[in-house]
Amino acid sequence: APPRFNADATLGRIDIAPTEIDTSPRVDIGVVADIKVALGQLIAACDGKITPATYQSWRDRLAGTNASKVAEQEKVLANDATPIHPLRLCKEVGDFLDRDAVLVVDGQEILNYGRQSIPTFTPRHRINSGCFGTMGVGLPFGVGAKIAKPDNQVLVLHGDGSFGLNAMEMDTCVRHGVPITVVISLNGGWTADPDGDKPGRDLGYKRYDLMAEAFGCHAEYVESPDDIRPALERAAEANAAGKPALVNVVADHTARATTTAFTRYTT
């Protein structure tokens, strides 16, 4: 993989704690300061020295790369193939969500795909599981979000692996009357693996919908892209009646989330 920074770049670190300055692997310029004050001073120092034309060629190159990535993504978003591509699932979820919905995304591939394709329009209405190590928090986050905002639509988009870590909280939703919708990107194993040689890759398409149904949830199993939206609408009807819902969507196990259009990323 290429380095994240140009080897010739000068790297600076601003930290309010003097003891933290040299904890980074490499620091060329260390500044002990309040970051807000220091950045204000840097902006003032750069005034008139940097204009939009300064980095125009770089911006043009990025814009061209972004345009090609947008075109690639658009093809996948409209893909009707089965098993369903995770980006197609994300498109259906994004189109379905209310503008003020609370969206929780948790998993590996689906977390990255969700960041690339599902916008959020209201501050503090999107919750992610974060970078590595926190997988499984999606469903509990969704429960908390619905309790905090009972009048808002709350949807949790899970990978099947991350869902399994706290799947029993569907029972919590039923017992305590927390009507959220959980959508599972069911790719049948841990992470995408086009070569099929990773341990834990082929665990099968499990019927988490039947488990949720046994708890008392509204639950559906979806295998066709055209059936996603109707299933989401029925889940919303169940939520309106006070019932939690789970939509288990069979997803392409070979789809690996790579960097796509820069301008479409959200956190």
Indicate residue ranges for each PLM-predicted region.
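Short beta-alpha connecting loops at secondary-structure transitions
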Residues: 21-29, 124-128, 165, 169, ...
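Active-site diphosphate/adenylate-binding microenvironment
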Residues: 63-140, 145-146
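Glycine-rich, acidic loop regions that bind phosphate or pyrophosphate groups
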Residues: 1-61, 232-235
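Short gly/pro/ser/thr-enriched loop/turn and capping motifs at secondary-structure boundaries
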Residues: 18-22, 28, 38-39, 111-112, ...
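Glycine/aspartate-rich loop-and-adjacent alpha/beta segment that forms the canonical ThDP
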Residues: 1-2, 210, 225-267
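Conserved thiamine diphosphate
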Residues: 29-30, 34, 38, 44, ...
